[in-house]
C-alpha cells in the first residue's frame, strides 16, 4: 500500500487545503484523472515526502 495525503484546490480560498490521508494500492501520477468520494479530480501535482514516506497529491475537481 502507498500512503497518500490529499490536498484539494479551494477556489474561494485560492489555495490547496488538506483533505485526508488514504492508502491506495496503485501509483498515482501527475496529470492523471482519479475518482475519489464520488467526485472526479485531476492530479495537478505530486510531491513525495521521503521522511514521512507518504506522497502528497494536489487535486483539482474536474467539473466536466
Indicate residue ranges for each PLM-predicted region.
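Short, well-ordered loop/turn sites that connect or cap secondary structure elements
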Residues: 27-28
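Short acidic DE-rich linear segments
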Residues: 1-2, 61-64
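Short, solvent-exposed secondary-structure boundary/capping segments
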Residues: 50-60
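Short alpha-helix capping/helix-loop boundary micro-motifs
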Residues: 17-23
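Short, basic/aromatic beta-hairpin or loop at an interaction surface
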Residues: 1-17
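Short beta-strand-centered aromatic/proline hotspots
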Residues: 39-48
